[in-house]
Amino acid sequence: ILWFGSYMCGYSVEGYIPEYIVNDPVTYPDLKPDAAFDGWLGKHYYLKPNTPALVERESKALGKMMEAIYNYDNIHNQKHTVIGIQIENEPDMLATRHNEAHGYTPEQIWPDLIIMLDKLGQVVKSSPYDCYTRVNQTTTYPEYLTKSTAIAITEGIDYVGVDPYENSIQAIDGKLRQLRKIEGNYAHIAENGGEYANNDLLALKAFSLGCGYEIFEVITTPHPFLTEWTLRGIYNPDFTPKAHTQQIVDAFKIFKEAWVDLANANYLDIAGFNLKSNDGMEQTSESKNTTHAGIKWSTKSRGVAFAIEYNDHLTVASTKSDEMVFRNIQIKSIEKGHYDIDGNWVSEEKAEAPDNRLAMEPCIVYRIKF
């Protein structure tokens, strides 16, 4: 769940904030009253972070939401419907991007902002509902990693991810490797633009590093205030697909169906293929190794593929009719299938790999026991 409370892209947005806060700047002061302007969902302005009344009211609202989630799950057979809460949305922009508008320096804003994020995160952590907390950061200022570390080490925030809005595999790789260095952090791309045709490759790069990746967004509202943002969706605002929609859908189908192994395997045992160029190669072959297996993968149609070793099996898939040849293992059985929502492997059909050579069907996940 994305908790858009006091800050959305560093703004305080009227549409997300109760009227009694918007209309009472004495109790809930903002940084510079005459800096307010009308935007999507009404007034945009800059609430002063960590003021006692603001934190108290937002904490109460957040706590009520956590209670509602907890009660919902209890009524519905304890199904865990929420895995995490994002605290605010790109709150760092209040300290780093809107300074000219509100007149405060980053050094004046950061301490109170981090304390407030921590306090709100602790509301989630102290609730009866078990889930992680995260903050998403932008990457447009030099010290974003330092500030990400400062946020991640607080008691209330478990993880920090970034919103790079870049379609370079190398850039995504570099940012995730830096985030992995923060002790205890789950490095992840919290947002990246849905307009990028190579989101299939960018996501696979993240997964092959043992990290996470999220696309913003599936579809953008056609609201006239957001016309310039409609490029962000994987789909057009009228729900029609874009030119690259299907290849993203295909990739995320096989990621989803192999989710247990992607989530549990050591990242050194997750081999991603076709990650050498930002667009992916139309025809290419690559050889990679996991702990026990060697895999040679070949494509003639820009396949996006992976091989994951976990426990006593390899899980492999491609978005195209590719081929994998396996070395150093003795194959006992091959099954087509998927992992269900409870993490159980669902076998759908047997498969064969004569001479350890597997002719892969598009978007089919195979589990190979060895």
Kindly give the residue locations of the regions a language model identified.
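Aromatic-lined carbohydrate-recognition surfaces of secreted/lumenal glycan-active proteins
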Residues: 3-9, 68-90, 109-146, 184-195
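The substrate-binding groove and active-site-proximal loops of carbohydrate-active enzymes
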Residues: 39-60, 72, 76, 103-114, ...
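C-terminal beta-strand-rich structural cap/linker in extracellular carbohydrate-active enzymes
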Residues: 347-370
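Aromatic- and carboxylate-lined catalytic core of secreted/periplasmic carbohydrate-active enzymes
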Residues: 201-325
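Beta-strand-rich binding/interaction modules
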Residues: 322-341
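Catalytic-core region of carbohydrate-active enzymes that cleave or remodel glycosidic bonds
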Residues: 1, 121-131, 151-258
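Aromatic- and acid-rich polysaccharide-binding/catalytic face
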Residues: 83, 89, 102-108, 143-170
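Active-site-adjacent "subsite" loops/lids of carbohydrate-active enzymes
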Residues: 9-70
